[in-house]
Regions:
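Second-shell loop/turn segments in exported
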Residues: 84-85, 115-127, 233-241, 263-268, ...
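Glycine-rich, acidic and aromatic/proline-enriched surface loops and short helix-turn segments
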Residues: 94, 99-104, 182, 186, ...
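Extended, structured, electrostatic nucleic-acid-contact surfaces
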Residues: 280-292
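Acidic, Ser/Thr/Pro/Gly-enriched interdomain connector segments
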Residues: 212-268, 273
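Solvent-exposed, polar/charged alpha-helical surfaces in well-ordered, non-transmembrane soluble domains
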Residues: 131-138, 244-251, 255, 272-283, ...
Length: 307
């Protein structure tokens, strides 16, 4: 069983509907976020928790913000995906699941609108709702290293049901996937949510939150320039942490001339010398001087590995 690392509670999320005590899951090292839509306009009961995701985002239409409810730890498997016996793992495949309250079905949208039920139709969601999702994804990237990338194809519902848009991953593709996808992309499942949500805009907002830029659109004039490795998440750079990412960071600090605090060179264990070297690098960059605490975040990582 994996060991949980990093913060397990999304800041500001309510635990009024906490199900982990009754439906304990497996511990995981999360590297995937799956987005769902609830197909309802209020917080679901999830059968008392038996089919709950890790979190639910409920739009507060008057305040123009998302209210978050957390049901399981970030790195505890939740229960919102079909997981067939003997097939690929879904709920337990290093995935954090988020249900977005509202609908992706145009027929349901029209029905609710005619009945006067205020709701979010996620394929045409307002900016504040997309920004709320983006802030969560930015936090997941910063704290858990979930890549701000995902499938190119997000077909509209009902085409997305089953595999009508050809969007659903094979078992092998799912096992290799890292990043953000929809319920519509997960194998062994047939649901088509969240439909044609504006995924490109969500990623744009998430990257703006972190000031990391849009790597997919950046073209360099020097093809031989090494690609910046994906930021693994802050959880790997805490006191006593031992992992390959610490060594990779340390080697790059030495390469860039910021290894003065090492006595014998970088290692796999995060220590005070690493923090001081990172702080020296941060102080050398005007973009980072206001936050030179020695803890690497996405922007520090990108700038360090960009040359």
């Amino acid at each position: 069983m994996s060991t949980k690392t990093g913060p397990q509670r999304y800041p500001g999320a309510s635990r009024a509907n906490w199900y982990q005590d009754d439906f304990g899951g497996d511990a995981m090292q999360v590297n995937v976020v799956v987005l769902h839509t609830t197909e309802g306009y209020s917080l679901p009961g999830y059968g008392g928790g038996s089919s709950a995701p890790n979190l639910t985002a409920v739009p507060d239409l008057a305040a123009k913000k998302l209210k978050w409810y957390q049901h399981f730890d970030i790195e505890t498997s939740s229960r919102a995906l079909v997981n067939l016996r003997g097939g690929v793992e879904t709920n337990t495949m290093n995935v954090c699941q988020v249900e977005l309250t509202g609908t992706c079905d145009p027929k349901t949208h029209a029905k609710w609108k005619a009945a006067g039920h205020a709701h979010v139709y996620w394929p045409d969601a307002p900016d504040w709702a997309l920004q709320g999702v983006a802030r969560f994804l930015a936090w997941m990237h910063e704290e858990h290293g979930v890549a701000l990338s995902g499938p190119k194809t997000w077909p509209a519902y009902p085409t997305s049901y089953g595999n009508g848009g050809g969007q659903r991953m094979t078992g092998a593709q799912w096992s290799d996937f890292k990043g953000v996808c929809g319920h519509m992309h997960v194998p062994e499942n047939v649901h088509g949510d969240p439909g044609a949500i504006d995924f490109a805009r969500i990623l744009k907002y998430a990257k703006a939150e972190l000031d990391v830029g849009d790597d997919d659109t950046v073209q360099t004039s020097t093809p031989s320039k090494p690609k910046v490795p994906a930021f693994p998440g802050r959880k790997y750079f805490v006191a006593g942490a031992t992992n390959a990412h610490v060594l990779t960071l340390g080697k790059q600090l030495v390469k860039r001339g910021f290894g003065d605090h090492y006595r014998v060179g970088p290692s796999r264990t995060w220590g005070e010398a690493d923090r001081l070297n990172v702080r020296d690098f941060q102080k050398s960059r005007k973009e980072l001087r206001g936050d030179a605490d020695g803890t690497p975040g996405p922007l520090t990582w990108r700038l360090l590995f960009s040359a």
